Amino acid sequence: MLDRLHLCVITDATLVPGRDHVAIAQAALSAGADMIQLRDKTSDLRTLLAQARAVQALCRSSGAVFIVNDRLDLALASDADGVHVGQDDLPVEAARRLLGPGRILGVSTHERNQAEEAQARGADYIGFGPMFRTGTKDTGYTPRGLNMLREIRAAVSLPILAIGGITLENVVEVIAAGATAPAVISAIVAAPDVAAATAAFRERVALAKNLGQSGQVPRWDP
């Protein structure tokens, strides 16, 4: 399932006033997103739980994967498909133990050793980045770039979600460099039309995957 992903949309309710997690997820799912990750560092748990349950219902009806960023308690309470943890969050082994074997565990990585450790400790997929410059999330790391993504792809067998500064102009080369799928925040969530932006990304990723299977080197020339 995870190795067939095309597009993860990470919800951020702070980017556009009045556009909450549910509205973002509904629009993205209608246009082909096959993973939604709910990311919220500020809202109270009661509000988040109501929105997470609504997003999970939307994902289930669409056959998409629902992941909660950081908050294991919220993931379990909302019956999410899994949780995504960062390098400074709950350790991978502890997250896996609490999450159980039947749910998905994703781990943010920025270096080869982190990716290898995440795989060894039981992650189901890794996030890798930031690929390029981004103003959405400050990881403390400089952009990793395509060459490091190729290195990570050669080092681990897990699905890789590439994140950070990914746009329609560079997503094809990101897939060609070894990413399973992009994880996109601002290029979709802050777009004038979330569904249209999602559809454009989905089409571009499908193009990259098809070209890769045919042995061609996918490049996008805008």
Feature locations, PLM:
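A short, flexible beta-alpha/helix-coil linker loop
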Residues: A13, F132-T134
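Glycine-rich beta-strand-to-loop/alpha-helix junction loops that act as flexible
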Residues: F128, L161-I166, P182-S186
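Glycine/threonine-rich flexible loop motifs
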Residues: K137-D138
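Conserved N-terminal beta1-alpha1 strand-loop-helix module at the mouth
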Residues: M1-D89, R97-Y125, Y141-R144, E151-L158, ...
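Short, small-residue-rich loop/turn micro-motifs
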Residues: P130, G178
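A short, mixed-charge helix-start or loop-turn motif at secondary-structure junctions
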Residues: Q37-K41, T134, A183
